[in-house]
Amino acid sequence: MENFKLKYFLGANSCEGFYSVFDKCYLPDGEWRVFIIKGGPGTGKSSFMKYFAAKAADKEIKTLLCPCSSDPDSLDAVILPEKKVVIMDGTAPHTVDPSYPGACEKILNFSEFWNDAAFDADKKEIIETTLLNKALHKTASRYMQAAGQLITDNYKTALACTDREKTLNFAQRLCRKLIPAKSDARPGTEWVRFIGGITPRGVVAFSGTVTASADRTVIINDDYGSASNIIIDYVREYALKNGYGIITLKNPFLPSLFCDHIIIPELNLAFATENCYTHFHSDARRIHARRFVSQKQLHLSRERIKFNKKATKELFLSAAETLSRAKAVHDKLEGYYIKAMDFERLTAFAEKFTKDVLD
């Protein structure tokens, strides 16, 4: 997966609970073909998608990988935007079912490749292990919810010190300069994804996806999001109003509150937020949020802000450690399914399926 430059998450272990945008990675317009895989852990869903992605890349088809936020080494989805094809894992916690079965979506049932009798001796262990995995994810979610309160507190503190009018005027000038207006344009299409999130490894960010998607990137350096959120929100509205298709990359911790980045493919242009968790190795222009924020006023809350940042870091660490324990439990659960699978049949199916879809 290291050879693929474009990686996104379609789900996030956020401070608001698990947040899924799986249903926003395609349009039910009669042109997209969506294959939803159903099956248990360890049944080859990720390997199937990796095989498909590799073959698509061999044919020089633009291929987007969507790793799993609970295990970034595994895939949750593969998107071929130019061919309008999606393959995704439709199992919990990001359960996806067809809305337009046959016309748009089709289920790939991987239970067809396992031996039901192989589970007979392990039913109790499978249920207990599944429940333990769910309990650990709930514990991680509570750590994230607590962190969310502290992140929000710092955001509101910084927002109270931010000159909103000055920030908005800057955003307007920036958009007029970089985004050509279109007359009588229909609203553009928006694709919603993530490039970061909390995982068993800690916070992971695919910042390279943004810079690989655009020739020009405007980076807003803002640890609290008070100014960057105003700018990014305005960019989003302006681009959509002028008929540009955009990729909106939400904040993985508070997705209902923040949009972190906007990519406008038609213009080869991106606007990105740089903070404690997402860094860009780029010489691109940087806008520093402090020019819009009263540092004197913000300084009055420095102790609270410092405490919140330190406590958030500890809560994220605890959440990651808990997710790591959950992954170990999930790996054990996979073992029960692996020994029940007929991978030879699945491999043959993967080869035929891939040939049929790509040729």
Predicted features along the sequence, with ranges:
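A detector of single, family-specific signature residues
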Residues: 1, 48, 149
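N-terminal pre-Walker A segment at the start of P-loop NTPase domains
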Residues: 1-26, 165, 169-209
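Conserved nucleotide-sensing/catalytic segment adjacent to the nucleotide-binding pocket
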Residues: 2-19, 54-118, 124-125, 236-317
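Charged, compositionally biased non-catalytic regions
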Residues: 21-32, 40
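Glycine-rich phosphate-binding P-loop
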Residues: 34-53, 200-239
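A cross-family "folded-core" feature that marks the main globular domain of proteins
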Residues: 37-38, 48-49, 56, 64-67, ...
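An accessory alpha-helical subdomain
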Residues: 125-177, 307, 311-353
